[in-house]
Structure formats: C-alpha cells, structure tokens
Amino acid sequence: MIRFLVTIAVLLALPGLANAQQFPSDLFNTQIDGSVAAWIIRTFGLLTVLSVAPGILIMVTSFPRFVIAFSILRSGMGLASTPSNMILLSMAMFMTFYVMSPTFDKAWTDGVQPLLQNQINEQQAVQRIAEPFRTFMNANTRDKDLKLFVDIARERGQVVMTDNVVDYRVLVPAFMLSEIRRGFEIGFLIILPFLVIDLIVATITMAMGMMMLPPTSISLPFKILFFVLIDGWNLLVGSLVRSFN
C-alpha cells in the first residue's frame, strides 16, 4: 500500500514539478517579477491537483465497479445500512489495490524507481508512470464507449490521437462509462435472485391474507440465509476480480 501511495503522489506531483523553477530568493520583495508570479501559479496548480487526488484515483482504477456492485447488493437484500458505507468503501478500496497491484508495481518499477535514482527526468517519469494505467484502461474499455468520445471530440475539432495513442481526455471518460455499465450489469445479476425471493414471499403473504405485513420484513431473513448458503461474498468478489482484463 505504501508503494501505491508513493506512486500516486509522484504521478500527481510531477506535472507541476516538471515545469517548476527554483524558488526565487526575492519572493518577499515589494516588486514581484514574472518568475515569482509563475512560481505561485504553478504551486497553486499543484495544490489543486493534489486536492482532487481521490477523484483522479477513482477515474483510472477499478474502484467504481466494486462500489456499484456492493451498493446494489446491499439494496437488493433490503439492508439500509448494513454493511455500512465505511465497510463497503473499505472493501472496494482494498479490492482495487488487489486488482491494480500489477499496474502499481509496473508504474513503480518503470517510473518511480528510475526517478528516485536520478536515471530519468520528471517528464519521462510522468510518461512511464502513466503508461501502465493507460494499458489497464485500454484493456477494460468498451470499443463502443471509446468510439463515442472519439466521435464527440472530433466533432469539436479536438485532436484525439497522437502517434496512434488515444488522448487521456478521451480514454478516461470512456473507461469510466464502461466501468459504470459493467457495475450495473453485475448488479442486475446480483439483485435478480433477491427479487425472486421477494415475489415468492409477497405471493404467499397475499394468499394467506396477511395484507398488513410488509413482505420485505419476512423475506429479509430468507435472503440473508440464501446469500450465506451459496457463499455469496466469495462468488461476488471472485466474479468481480475475474471480470477485469
């Protein structure tokens, strides 16, 4: 996890550091020249990027698919707050670490380590660190979603490819759209058996004339029992992890 955090921190910090100049000694003089103003702007931009680091992490990893699947599971079982949001987010985060570990390791080996050893400069490090994430997103993005954003960008006159490589402005939203879609596809398969249990219980209670008794309160124990008997967590997590390319 420490390697992951260092990799993300370097990836976020390098774009600002790559163009940063040395801190000027006359920063507090009454007359501020252009270099000082540029340094202030770059520092402000770097702090802004670091403040949105969690959002950047969500955009380029497997986190959305896990969160959507776990949330739909909880809703399908009829549990309002069990497991809690903290537990679901923690599970999604550590499952993301597991799925993304080859990507993090490659980014660390190819980009961070050579930079720390002064073998490459900051610009080369940014490219090497970002390349494993590009490979992961390319492998898990639907062609239809990618084509959608490519067509929209071309309609606006934007350059979407450089040296046969798709621009991140196109790849990242296409990847997020694909992740959300797959999350809902898996969620549908999760919620379907619970819906069947609800329908069976509702039919039985209506046949018995128990109109005032909510069917969901009766079906909840059966849904929990069903999920435990089929080892649902094992099946769900295994299916989610194997669904990534």
From Swiss-Prot:
NCBIfam families in alphabetical order: fliP (TIGR01103), PRK12797.1 (NF009438)
Membrane topology designation: Multi-pass membrane protein
UniProt xrefs under Pfam families: FliP
Family: Belongs to the FliP/MopC/SpaP family.
Annotated localization: Cell membrane; Bacterial flagellum basal body
Keyword Membrane assigned: yes
Organism: Agrobacterium fabrum (strain C58 / ATCC 33970) (Agrobacterium tumefaciens (strain C58))
GO-annotated biological processes: bacterial-type flagellum organization; protein secretion
Full protein name: Flagellar biosynthetic protein FliP
Protein transport as UniProt keyword: yes
Protein task: Plays a role in the flagellum-specific transport system.
Transmembrane segments: 4-24, 44-64, 84-104, 186-206, 218-238
InterPro entries documented for this protein: FliP (IPR005837), T3SS_IM_P (IPR005838)
GO CC annotations on file: bacterial-type flagellum basal body; plasma membrane
Superkingdom as given in the UniProt entry: Bacteria
Keywords linked to the UniProt accession: Bacterial flagellum, Bacterial flagellum biogenesis, Bacterial flagellum protein export, Cell membrane, Membrane, Protein transport, Transmembrane, Transmembrane helix, Transport
